[in-house]
Amino acid sequence: MSLNKVQEKILADFAQKNKHWPKAQLDAALWQVKWQLTALPHQKEPEGGEYDTFLMLAGRGSGKTHTASHWIGIRAWQYPGTRWLVTAPTTNDIRATCFEGDSGLLNIIPHSLIKDYNKSLGEITLINGSLIQGIPASEPERYRGKQYHGAWFDELCAFEYNDDAYDGV
């Protein structure tokens, strides 16, 4: 999402006010402020109350991937040393859409916060020790024992082993 002039001013003022912060801390804060300024109403998670599922059911181009990348990326940053699962129907879906796509994690999370991207293992490690792991829904047995702190199920309706995938997490 592009910023309007008011949003640009808010970000510039925030950056100026906090320029003494370490780069990673400032980049993370600017990322989160920018997301709050630009997220559309249907892209914001529900307010208030505890919940264990946040479902975004919407059409093509509505920002589902963009929303999920921000949601899981911000949490992985806010909770150091945590483990997060990204799953989609195939390994290629994870790589091409969820990790490397235009709205994928590698284009959403500030580069200064990413320690490593292991393409062959499908893992993004943040500098705070959090791990975002991509495992295809076609291999739900690989979810077991990982004790993830949260998960992003992309294109859940296309999962071959829907129940096994959901139950495994």
List each model region and its residues.
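Phosphate/NTP-binding elements of NTP-utilizing enzymes
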Residues: S2-V169
